[in-house]
């Protein structure tokens, strides 16, 4: 099955404390979760690793959110959109369902 949302897609968050925020998908995880740039920022406490020259302390980073809580962002309509698949010239392509434009 082809993925409706892929890495580097611009998405919008549908639920949670970050609802309405937009960002690029930086990583797709195998358990149905994604990491979106600038969304769900958490603070991790990291230990120093002198052998690698890493200083410890508080580090802010993005946490994974479920793929069902995001939707692809359509720049033409400035809204969240659904994704469909169709074949064009023998290749399977994704398109926005609202305006049939290829992604």
Swiss-Prot record:
One of its GO terms (cellular component) is ribonucleoprotein complex. Keywords: Ribonucleoprotein, Ribosomal protein, RNA-binding, rRNA-binding. GO terms for biological process: translation. The keyword Repressor does not apply. The keyword RNA-binding applies. GO terms for molecular function: rRNA binding; structural constituent of ribosome. CDD domains: KOW_RPL26. SMART domains: KOW. One of two assembly initiator proteins, it binds directly to the 5'-end of the 23S rRNA, where it nucleates assembly of the 50S subunit. One of the proteins that surrounds the polypeptide exit tunnel on the outside of the subunit. NCBIfam families: rplX_bact. Belongs to the universal ribosomal protein uL24 family. Part of the 50S ribosomal subunit. This is Large ribosomal subunit protein uL24.
